Amino acid sequence: MILKPIGVVKSPFKTQNDAPRQGRFSDAVSEIAIFDEYADGLHKIENLRHIIVLYWMDKASRDKLRVVPPGETEERGVFTTRSPSRPNPIGLCVVEILEVERNRLKVRWLDALDGSPVIDIKKYSPEIDCVNQLEGQQP
């Protein structure tokens, strides 16, 4: 499997300690610069208010399968958490689009570190992406 980045994040977060635990916990503004060869994929993106950004957490540890989540005392498998430490460190954030200028998007709520490769952008659709209640799910 080969993933090709479509762009790069310009972020105020330089290290993992700078970044919020979740992007929604910060109003910091970041920029997503889409590479020229993918810029046409942004056609009409100015009509959207929110998007899903998938990015590669290139500074995250890839050798952990168990972690202790913040606020907890017991280990859990990484697939039951939102930890950046995981075999394939793919980050996912729903962000608010603040401004679009050619191949650059200014966004809020992105927790990616500066220089993180962007691997995909998708339309956020509340009817599909927002689950109000999951029966039987434990916190």
UniProtKB/Swiss-Prot annotation:
Pfam families: TrmO_N (PF01980). Belongs to the tRNA methyltransferase O family. InterPro entries: TrmO-like_N, UPF0066_cons_site, YaeB-like, YaeB-like_sf, YaeB_N_sf. CDD domains: UPF0066. NCBIfam families: tRNA_TsaA. Coiled coil: none annotated. The keyword S-adenosyl-L-methionine applies. Keywords: S-adenosyl-L-methionine. Homodimer. This is S-adenosyl-L-methionine-binding protein AF_0241. S-adenosyl-L-methionine binds at residues 16, 20-22, 58-59, 82, 92, 113-116.
